[in-house]
Amino acid sequence: MRCPYCQSEDTQVKDSRPAEDGAVIRRRRVCSVCGGRFTTFERVQLRDLMVVKKSGRRVPFDRDKLTRSIEVALRKRDVDNDRVERAISGIVRQLESSGEAEVTSDEIGRLAMDALKGIDDIAYIRFASVYRNFSKAVDFHNVIDELTVAETEDDLDA
């Protein structure tokens, strides 16, 4: 593994342990040249997914882009990073295990919204405003109403 600080390929693994309920291996590494320390994650990738954009263009699935989108929605929210990482891994597992080589950007957005709904209401609303392309204040009210109805139904089921 190349050092992110000095680009040397002489790095050593100092610690390995399972993460995300065993779905990932977390490795602490140290560079033999500059002494820099960094963490890497090893995940299983079942297949190369292609994302079909709304324009019809096809691009390779990018887990980092999904992560950034969810992190933007969660900015300044007090949410445990492990919980977020588990949600992202869950989305990726769903996509990879679907058996399809292509997935639409809408499907990825829907899965991200479902995950955020279970994590943080404010992040859910933020993500929905971009994903659903809100243009009026009433769009926000509608999503808040959806959340309120869902919470009321959950309270009745409990």
Curated annotation (Swiss-Prot):
GO terms for molecular function: ATP binding; DNA binding; zinc ion binding. Pfam families: ATP-cone, Zn_ribbon_NrdR. A zinc finger (unnamed) spans 3-34. One of its GO terms (biological process) is negative regulation of DNA-templated transcription. Keywords: ATP-binding, DNA-binding, Metal-binding, Nucleotide-binding, Repressor, Transcription, Transcription regulation, Zinc, Zinc-finger. Residues 11-20 have a biased composition (Basic and acidic residues). Residues 49-139 form the ATP-cone domain. Transmembrane segments: none annotated. Residues 1-20 are annotated as: Disordered. The keyword Nucleotidyltransferase does not apply. Binds 1 zinc ion. NCBIfam families: transcriptional regulator NrdR (TIGR00244). Belongs to the NrdR family. This is Transcriptional repressor NrdR. The lineage of its organism: Bacteria, Pseudomonadati, Pseudomonadota, Alphaproteobacteria, Hyphomicrobiales.
